[in-house]
């Protein structure tokens, strides 16, 4: 157990508490002197703020007992989480699949609250449901005299009930949403719980949002203020004044939100709510209501090529059985839907179309339902029947036809250009036109969001769009472009009645339609089958490629390669489970189907990326922190961010924040200034769940942040586990969530040693430097100072000159520089003046294989990117961090060159597709272990990313992000490619009695990795070579100044600094004014030299800031991380030295 103390973190009194107590779920010793089991804490505590949490647990237990008594089963974890929210007074939307018991929960909660004399209001969409629900709730032990149901009533009864409603003479009121709309004036304003069972129906009348808010205690003025803030937030091109106004109004609304008297719980929407009024819930109640989409798929994706669509369709429908959706490609037109229906029915297959009543299909009386494979089609968009739908067959590849005429819709032209872009890029002659195409795409994308009415009302805008259409049309009909399309493997050009039309795959249509076969239910995700009847090979190839932009896990297989019998058996097994759950045959305690889990990561970017992998998340705000909620398999995930470290060593207690006693070293941590809201919000959020997964970065810093968060949350959550992932991809996250682990205490100890060493040495040295120079901002870190010394020494060498006679050869893009060095300037000048030619003797000529460089580690990436692009090392680390968080590269703080099987798969796919299978040459490079090289996570090159940005699928990437990504991508792909076979020559160069040997690479015999990562060739020199016009006499430095990149390279070579600290060291030297950067080179300042000389002259200080001390300490920290060294012994040795040094009062 690691010993540590956290200031102000006792969950009961807010005082000091040990990490040991926190991790055991206990308050501090002052609050509870004896150590008891977590379960006994509430019984033993007499007073304090933790009693509120105890009361929550007690209320939850009472509700669970009540639930079990009325229903005969225990509630599921998700229902318990909803109950916690109600008891905590938090309004929320229920994101949950079919069969999880949303209605049951609402009724049980209303019934439970009624026993306490608290009022509930249940709002339903139809009169029929009002009657069904009222009958059901009577079986929940509700006193019927305290229940008001607004159903089919006589006028007398209506009058009587309205009077009772007005007086508040009831515990539970059940009505339709229309009743609320017409009668809200008579409704009391003291409801404890309002349950909206069908939010889609509720929202048909947008004013219902206002009315339910009145019931919760808000005024008309409050709602007006909230709506004004919504309008302000949605205003385009906001000014600084607008942002100030948003801040001011948000603070005012936070106060208004405290008026809320009850809890509103609504079921999540199944359609996209159209009214902006729905956003009032976000501003006043802290939660969003949107259409949740689940992007998880459990679908076997197959295809077959066919010349006869109808016959093949009939064969497959008969083979697959009932529960099928048939999607006709939109290029066949709506009439084809009827044709297909008639054809199937003429061969004994009962079918219905999307325009007919689907009840026959749901009952199993119709074998298939037929629609169009477009995301706009109701069958592709709206059907959610997990117990019925088993498979989807695509009658032709889903396609979009783009007529090449002026009237073509803006969105279709956009698709056409996006599909054409990669083809233009591969053509050397057309490459120069990509910029123009990109500009068109950006403009078309902007216009695609505008409605026809909006455009019609603005003649200038209409003209601009018409002119753009004409430009694009002329381009698409150009002879060379038409030829390019005709020869393409992915696009089809057809000559129809109205001229040429371009045919591209409808990717969103495919994903939306096939997704109907795999739906969330209370047991997870149903298995489905999607089968494409390929009528156009090019369109299918286009579909295969584009579908990977959305989901890397989709792989089409030929139908012959699939065990169809087994797939259909698994599909039927799932449908049976769904039916049993819907019919109530499966009891909840048989299996915990959907489990709520809190996931904490470091950054909001990472939280968003992860949440978006699994669907469109719903947002909430708790205690000032943002939470995203989404379904991941059988987990209901609430994901939030800690924004990095939350705690740091205190500054003014004990020995620089550490209790040092008898060989024991106990750090004291405090909340970092500005992070108080995060601590409060995380603890409030923790009270809603039983499990938290900590997904901080996979290194020592991430492990320590995670361990701190574990200590913070443990009093409220019994299960705190660590999840580790080295790339932010759907597959990696899912694997991590399914395989949590304990915290690795060795990693935590290593970070603890690093932080304490930095604090002890840094504080002591900085104090002395600040006093000596009377500048309070100066510092002297244990890594900073030796690195400053190198820069100073390098500058001294830079000022010393040597003389070089340089000969430069340029030949067909090839370069070679030969240099003859001299210490004496006169001798150099004499050599230069007499040099007319050189003699090149070929000593050996051979063929050899040149291997590619390994993939990047942190130091090699920083060196190459910094030197190539002149981007600072801290900025590069920020760019890499963001690329990692967006899910585009693996973790960027690494010393490893190892390539995983997943990485090799990424390379294989891209190299085989783009360059040819013969160039793929897999290599693992480094040793085994958790860490991997820096590589792309998907087989997408930089132009794919640009296309995705233009299509709106990737946001927030800058030119610099793309430069770094391209470098990482090419270096990695090169590392997985064939060596290059080259011709080399070993030559001896003689000139005026001087000679030197060189190895020249003169010819590429067989292509390999050079296809992506250029290989330098030198001119083929031999015999006597005239150099009179190629020579130059120069004075050059003995050594060149460091660049940021070469400084990182030096740190790595000398064993100082680590992947997580390189950038910090460089930025500290610049921030403190010890070093400046000029033309990309690092130059020590006068202050930097003075500080270094001052420290160097103090023999008692220098050992602590020497290269040797720092390197040894880094090695010891590595050993602590590996469990080979006791961290307390390392701290003990360090303490003795620092303490001695302090006492000496240097």
Swiss-Prot record:
Functional note: Modifies the topological state of DNA by introducing positive supercoils in an ATP-dependent process, increasing the linking number in steps of +1. Binds to single-stranded DNA, transiently cleaves and then rejoins the ends, introducing a positive supercoil in the process. The scissile phosphodiester is attacked by the catalytic tyrosine of the enzyme, resulting in the formation of a DNA-(5'-phosphotyrosyl)-enzyme intermediate. Probably involved in rewinding DNA strands in regions of the chromosome that have opened up to allow replication, transcription, DNA repair and/or for DNA protection.
Assembly behavior: Monomer.
Motif, DEAD box: chain positions: 197-200
Subcellular location: Cytoplasm
Record-linked Gene3D superfamilies: 2.60.510.20, 3.40.50.140, P-loop containing nucleotide triphosphate hydrolases, Topoisomerase I, domain 2, Topoisomerase I, domain 4
Principal location class: cytoplasm
Domain of life per record: Bacteria
Pfam families: DEAD (PF00270), Topoisom_bac (PF01131), Toprim (PF01751), zf_Rg (PF17915)
GN (gene name): rgy1
UniProt protein name: Reverse gyrase 1
InterPro entries assigned: AAA+_ATPase (IPR003593), DEAD/DEAH_box_helicase_dom (IPR011545), Helicase_ATP-bd (IPR014001), P-loop_NTPase (IPR027417), Reverse_gyrase (IPR005736), Topo_IA_2 (IPR003601), Topo_IA_cen (IPR013497), Topo_IA_cen_sub1 (IPR013824)
GO CC list: cytoplasm
Positions of Zn(2+) binding: 10, 13, 28, 31
Catalytic activity: ATP + H2O = ADP + phosphate + H(+)
EC class: isomerase
GO molecular function, one term: reverse gyrase activity
UniProt KW Flavoprotein keyword: no
Domain remark text: Introduction of positive supercoils requires the cooperation of both domains. The helicase-like domain probably does not directly unwind DNA, but more likely acts by driving ATP-dependent conformational changes within the whole enzyme. A beta hairpin in the 'latch' region of the N-terminal domain plays a regulatory role in the enzyme, repressing topoisomerase activity in the absence of ATP and preventing the enzyme from acting as an ATP-independent relaxing enzyme; it also helps to coordinate nucleotide hydrolysis by the ATPase domain with the supercoiling activity of the topoisomerase domain.
Needed co-factor(s): Zn(2+); Mg(2+)
Binding site residues for ATP: 79, 96-103
EC number, as in UniProt: 5.6.2.-
Domain Toprim residue range list: 596-728
RG N-terminal-type ZnF: 1-38
GO biological process, one term: DNA topological change
Domain Helicase C-terminal positions: 412-565
